[in-house]
Swiss-Prot record:
This is Biotin synthase. It holds the Pfam family BATS. The gene is bioB. Catalyzes the conversion of dethiobiotin (DTB) to biotin by the insertion of a sulfur atom into dethiobiotin via a radical-based mechanism. PANTHER family: BIOTIN SYNTHASE, BIOTIN SYNTHASE, MITOCHONDRIAL.
Amino acid sequence: MQEIFLCSISNVRSGDCKEDCAYCTQSSHHQGAIKRYKFKDEKVVLQEARALRELGALGFCLVTSGRELDDEKCEYIAKLAKAINQEELGLHLIACCGRADLEQLEFLRDAGIHSYNHNLETSQNFFPKICSTHTWEERFITCENALRAGLGLCSGGIFGLNESWEDRIEMLRALASLSPHTTPINFFIKNPVLPIDAETLSADEALECVLLAKEFLPNARLMVAGGREVVFKDNDKKEAKLFEYGINAVVLGDYLTTKGKAPKKDIEKLLSYGLTMATSCH
């Protein structure tokens, strides 16, 4: 039976980001109807970590909005990492905090963070069409810094931004050059507050994207993330094909500002596909 890994997300700092990423409701440029807060209380984060671990999650990603890491964010994430690790839950801790230099990433590593997530999002050529406040090159450098710091690298992208197939290939080729441990695969879902006018990918096109990712990243853990619950809604047969085509990890529960599938029902569905849940990160 195929084994899959469950990962979960905690949005520990939400909204009011000054970047203008066209796909993100946390950008202050778009005024999305989302919850905004500076730092989530440590007790709440610990409760989330315990609950998600009990459901079977092995990965736990601490996400902060904003362009980059700063001293305040570093201290906050380090404090959370130490508190979670003291619980001895066996969670693989991931930080996702934007642009970061080598020294910052080494600090997080020493505090107990295991991996760093920083997505390329799309191709170098297409990126200026979805963001003008920072460059694709900055993202790539942060990924390199994570590797230099000795952290696991989690890096992927978004399909369905009106990019071409050539853009998809270029993004995957760039990701392959980084050899990420895990690659999140997101599918863009149209939102009236966002400037991107793109129709939701069909399940068939989404599956083609997964096949392409598997071709370029045969050794990465391919994790289906945002958009799965919309693209494959009420289509169990095609959702099951995700795992035949190369997906071996799933985001369990909610995303940053959107609802995911109910965790218990999602796990039941995954089990019905003949999958087993991994019990350790290896």
